[in-house]
């Protein structure tokens, strides 16, 4: 076969060898099963950019590259494959032992081993390993994303080399190669069509996510992983490997994977602050001990005690358990959580960037009210259009399926259709832009039926005879109106026997919104969520979909972002543009990624939905990546949450649940920080002033009891906030400090009054350590009932799991005191009852203080302070960063 004479064996094949299926049965199947035949519409499941100079793209299509040229270009640009970065899993696991809380736990383990306190050593090491294993397992899955992207690439390619058409492995293609494209070709690289007078239909769903094929002519660009549906042409390769769109998408995924997650930053910030408190407390204790010439072993024991209680060693485990229980609950609602921290992020999401197809819409074409020429009945138009449709269920395209399913609304056309006999059927011709069928009516009349691009159908009629001016004008105006509203229009015409062609009208069709989407969008607004559409579809289609859903219609072409070296907006103007836009259409992976990144730079928590390979980078970049029903493997791997139920409503349900889970975590963190501050203040003062401390074993039990009792917080009854929730850390610290001080004062009063001759807690006998242990355990355990409530602590009934866990721990702590476990001696029941009563009094004081703080706007303002206005500086920084990005892009293109 010649390089310039592609085979035409499969071209112009009019009738398949397969028998036509019964039209009545086909229509019945399609109408009874809305998903019938749709499986073939679904998408396949599955470094640095090197621009190629234009002088290397002047290859003669008839000759191609020589072997020497191929060798030179392969040395310069490498193989046509994505770079593989081997991740060191051992190092990845070790990094989970790095962090403020982990450092304190490790220091405590070393101290415990040095003091031969093997019980404490074992407990601390077990907590360290538990936290590390949970984190490692959650993040290990991310490494499969690039592998899933690779599955979309072709395995072989037909190229012109040395004047001959040869088949080679796809990874051996180099820039400047001439590729032959034909029906079914999976394009292995990015390139530009060089054949004259050609027309291809290319499925770009792997890039744009939109299932309808697009037309490509001479000079148009084609992209790696796209599939040629119909037509033949030659293409010159302009980019290979990591420089292709799919390669750059993989690079964006790797870039998005880098860095520390939002929740990890919050925990590290809390741990770092507590570590500072620990260091300050230790300095005070050491100075006091050295002043009294205390021996080194007691000093080390004091250090171990303060280290254990100063940082909440169980914080990661309890928070992880809370999110894991929430993930199990979400799984029952068909939402699979792949990254636990996504639950926390989803609770604070303010902007949802949603893909259109399949999420907001049904991903199935449906017909709308047709335009008919005067004198033509809609049933006649529908009958003609359905006659010009394939009758084979296997391979039936989306448009024919939509017409046949809609026959239920046209009973006369449906009844007449089986009476016609198909003599000849010509599938869609990308050149004439029409589908043609020759049929025989029940009366024996031969009729030619066509449907296709409206203006091409109009020209067919005009070539046969003049059309009245008013009909012509109305027809063209209707085409323009449908196009402006985002409809895909199909013209319909017929020719009876030897008569003239008749123009019948136009049938508009589009992917309609899901039935529940409009209500769900309103619910999202009520929850303080802004929905922006990011789609690869046309601007007109996106606007019409937004109009039907009640979303804003400020939809723009994604090219207007101007982040690839074009555009004249400054960085701050681009950020304003993205922030105020209701969505972007005709976008590629980089456009979606950039939009998410810009919104994040403005301080928003962003969620992104998607289903295709093209969505993988933005799914990974978003604070919460959401793969919707039917998503490809690459999208599912990149996402934090995978939904098995269709539509946006499932996402809103998950949002409410995540806010409930966040409320539980926030309650626990306030509680746990207050506990750490309580014991640091009390023990630090006790050691510094009286040179005494609790038994180290009792301190360990206090820490364990605090976390064991509150593990049940994961099952607590919790409300969901009506607005996005975030970590208000200044306020959180303010509340924790006040509660910690109240706890410390309560314990100090217990210590200083228990040995008084009259009115003390202990009369003539009892253990000092035992009473303090009980008082600390009771007040700390009950504190969770204060922090979990949004109002007074009695306004919200805790779950039986939480109440039961706290009660069991309280009983165990009471037994410790009654029987003198790990303390000097046993304590009588009267003293224990007095301790319970006193502890309840401290609990009531904490409840009142917490309620006042949580409802006081003045307290919130005091904690947060007055932030200086930095908008000008921020906008200047945005301008500078975008300018540098454009310079970098232009430099890459010129090298």
UniProtKB/Swiss-Prot annotation:
EC code(s) of this entry: 7.1.2.1
PROSITE patterns: ATPASE_E1_E2
Top EC group: translocase
UniProt GO molecular function: ATP binding; ATP hydrolysis activity; metal ion binding; P-type proton-exporting transporter activity
Active site feature: 355
Cellular component per GO, a single term: plasma membrane
Composition-biased stretches (Acidic residues): 37-46
Residue ranges annotated as Extracellular topological domain: 114-117, 291-301, 716-731, 823-834
Membrane spanning residue stretches: 93-113, 118-137, 269-290, 302-324, 697-715, 732-751, 802-822, 835-851
Region (Disordered): 1-53
Location within or outside the cell: Cell membrane
Residue stretches of biased makeup (Basic and acidic residues): 7-16
Alphabetical UniProt keywords: ATP-binding, Cell membrane, Hydrogen ion transport, Ion transport, Magnesium, Membrane, Metal-binding, Nucleotide-binding, Phosphoprotein, Translocase, Transmembrane, Transmembrane helix, Transport
GO terms of biological process kind: proton export across plasma membrane
Positions in the Cytoplasmic compartment: 1-92, 138-268, 325-696, 752-801, 852-895
Catalyses which reaction(s): ATP + H2O + H(+)(in) = ADP + phosphate + 2 H(+)(out)
Binding site for Mg(2+): 611, 615
Membrane topology: Multi-pass membrane protein
Role noted for this protein: The plasma membrane ATPase of plants and fungi is a hydrogen ion pump. The proton gradient it generates drives the active transport of nutrients by H(+)-symport. The resulting external acidification and/or internal alkinization may mediate growth responses.
Family assignment from sequence similarity: Belongs to the cation transport ATPase (P-type) (TC 3.A.3) family. Type IIIA subfamily.
NCBIfam families xrefs: ATPase-IIIA_H, ATPase_P-type
Protein name according to UniProt: Plasma membrane ATPase 1
Organism lineage string: Eukaryota, Fungi, Dikarya, Ascomycota, Saccharomycotina
Gene that encodes the chain: PMA1
